[in-house]
């Protein structure tokens, strides 16, 4: 998992509440459990004018010119600004997969659905919670100033706006540690590899009959 320490990125505003996981990545794209290939279908129903299905050549599909991610000024955005209750609905982990594979490193919103919030951390996506008034102000600024960027300093737990104001946010220490060090569940387990091997060796020495052996 890619570590997250500090990130400056272009902001894209998704100005709607209660964005659910089926809108983030529609159900027909969930047949694969491989963590690859979901970015082109992020917000598929909003992004394209036709109905998307797995295997379609997205480069030939008609784009919705009114959707924020299709507008030239937001191309290359890596910070998503959203409204309250982002990520509600079913608990599909494909939602943060699609967001990160598109290129987003962080989301800023007043609130999130719990399962989406937890899944985001496990996949290197930083979900930042700011107050509704501050989020509303950011929406106004993003829309008013093309090229609007935010600097996110995870170590200091602040979002730095172009005018220099710093917006503090909370994060659990363990989640912060994992993001700073690029550790997902597998990475955390591998940090205990020596202890795991030592336990297995001791177990085998004490209970050798538990080890399966080929029949002669």
From Swiss-Prot:
Cited InterPro entries: 3-IsopropMal_deHydase_ssu (IPR004431), Aconitase/3IPM_dehydase_swvl (IPR015928), AconitaseA/IPMdHydase_ssu_swvl (IPR000573), IPMI_Swivel (IPR033940), LeuD (IPR050075)
Catalytic reaction annotation: (2R,3S)-3-isopropylmalate = (2S)-2-isopropylmalate
Keywords, ordered alphabetically: Amino-acid biosynthesis, Branched-chain amino acid biosynthesis, Leucine biosynthesis, Lyase
Pathway recorded for this protein: Amino-acid biosynthesis; L-leucine biosynthesis; L-leucine from 3-methyl-2-oxobutanoate: step 2/4
Keyword Amino-acid biosynthesis applies: yes
BP-aspect Gene Ontology terms: L-leucine biosynthetic process
Mitochondrion found in the keyword field: no
Enzyme Commission code: 4.2.1.33
Cellular component annotations (GO), alphabetically ordered: 3-isopropylmalate dehydratase complex
Pfam families: Aconitase_C
GO molecular function: 3-isopropylmalate dehydratase activity
Protein family: Belongs to the LeuD family. LeuD type 1 subfamily.
Quaternary organization: Heterodimer of LeuC and LeuD.
HAMAP family to which the protein is assigned, alphabetical: LeuD_type1
Function: Catalyzes the isomerization between 2-isopropylmalate and 3-isopropylmalate, via the formation of 2-isopropylmaleate.
Name of the molecule in the record: 3-isopropylmalate dehydratase small subunit 1
Gene source species: Bordetella parapertussis (strain 12822 / ATCC BAA-587 / NCTC 13253)
Lineage start: Bacteria, Pseudomonadati, Pseudomonadota, Betaproteobacteria, Burkholderiales
Gene: leuD1
